[in-house]
């Protein structure tokens, strides 16, 4: 689209959670909106292994096929597993966890101390991570928590489980007993973008890395996201991406790149990827992290945007529909203000930039 305003648009600044726009585009581009994540149980000898496939929204018991969070359930998986074991004449097993889909550290060294309240250890299987999001109460080992829940459900389904849950890659000769599928990626991204869930976004980045045959590490994920953006025609020169969620203060992205991704998404050449990305963003005065912004003013219901907030950074990246029906793509980053200035920065973005655009009859 036509550039109407560019003030320091090429400067690489700390994007905060607007960084999630980069990850979301890449994930939709390589995996597709309909992609689902498989959690399965396999057996070798007397050991049933729970294999994580990237679903961090699992229900502990029954899944809800009408929901995104808790779409797949470990109780359902355990009951199907118990039936398969019964068919084999097996009544007693040990249980193991295979969380080897992701490699490397589960904590990013670029994250400041105290951020444990904002992100879980990055592992490929978890019980509904949104139950803990932004609460400061993430489990220290969410994958093992999920495995123990599966083991308990297997016991409840009538299988005798011996010993504690162990950890290790499933045997190469293991055969599948049962599996459950997550909600489609488009729905999963809607949760992570609207609520700005850091854990989910880091997992999504690692899935991009796996698709690109890279290591499913922080470095592999950020490298894969940037590579896909380049493949899709975006100029990532000057970008520093230390994580996929935007939690790292060392992330540096230009507002120009963010706006270009949004403009592409809103245009005819954005395709299904772009339409899905825009649909998944929070809406002003309606939901997600914009639910309490733009209430009763221009922008209510007409702004779709990803928020970003860190101690000294605020950003907003998305679209606004003007009073005369024109859709504009924008990205604003306010960086390096003093501690305590976040509310003022957000207010300036809303009142001095976005709301005037929404109120504008400026199609000419």
Regions found by a protein language model. Give the residues of each.
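Generic domain-boundary/flexible-linker signal
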Residues: 59-61, 106, 203, 328, ...
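Small-residue-rich helix-loop
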Residues: 6, 209-364
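Generic structural signal for residues positioned in beta-strands
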Residues: 40, 49, 94-96, 124-126, ...
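A small/polar active-site loop signature that marks catalytic segments
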Residues: 121, 131-276
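Active-site-adjacent loops and short helices of periplasmic peptidoglycan-processing enzymes
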Residues: 1-144, 154-190, 194-198, 210
């Amino acid at each position: 689209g036509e550039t109407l305003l560019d003030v320091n648009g090429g400067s690489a600044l700390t994007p905060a959670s607007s960084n999630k726009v980069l990850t979301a585009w890449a994930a939709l581009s390589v995996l597709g909106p309909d992609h689902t994540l498989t959690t399965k149980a396999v057996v070798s000898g007397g050991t049933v292994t729970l294999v994580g496939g990237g679903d961090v929204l699992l229900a502990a018991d029954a899944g809800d096929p009408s929901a995104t969070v808790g779409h797949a359930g470990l109780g359902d998986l355990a009951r199907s597993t118990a039936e398969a074991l019964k068919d084999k004449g097996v009544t007693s097993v040990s249980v193991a966890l295979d969380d080897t889909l992701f490699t490397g550290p589960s904590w990013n060294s670029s994250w400041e101390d105290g951020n444990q309240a904002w992100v879980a250890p990055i592992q490929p299987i978890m019980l509904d991570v949104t139950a803990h999001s932004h609460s400061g109460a993430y489990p220290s080992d969410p994958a093992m928590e999920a495995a123990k829940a599966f083991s308990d459900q297997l016991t409840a389904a009538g299988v005798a489980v011996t010993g504690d849950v162990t950890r290790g890659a499933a045997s190469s000769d293991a055969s599948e007993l049962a599996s459950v599928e997550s909600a489609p990626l488009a729905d999963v991204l809607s949760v992570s973008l609207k609520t700005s869930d850091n854990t989910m976004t880091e997992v999504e980045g690692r899935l991009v890395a796996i698709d690109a045959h890279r290591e499913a590490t922080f470095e592999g994920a950020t490298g894969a996201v940037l590579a896909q953006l380049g493949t899709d025609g975006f100029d990532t020169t000057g970008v520093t991406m230390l994580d996929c969620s935007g939690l790292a203060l060392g992330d540096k992205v230009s507002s120009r790149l963010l706006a270009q991704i949004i403009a592409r998404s809103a245009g005819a050449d954005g395709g299904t990827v772009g339409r899905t990305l825009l649909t998944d963003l929070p809406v002003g005065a309606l939901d997600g992290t914009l639910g309490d912004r733009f209430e009763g003013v221009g922008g209510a219901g007409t702004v779709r945007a990803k928020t970003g907030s860190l101690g000294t950074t605020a950003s907003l990246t998305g679209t606004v529909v003007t009073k005369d029906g024109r859709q504009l793509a924008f990205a604003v980053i306010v960086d390096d203000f003093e501690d305590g200035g976040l509310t003022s920065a957000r207010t300036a973005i809303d009142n001095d930039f976005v709301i005037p655009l929404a109120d504008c009859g400026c199609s000419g």
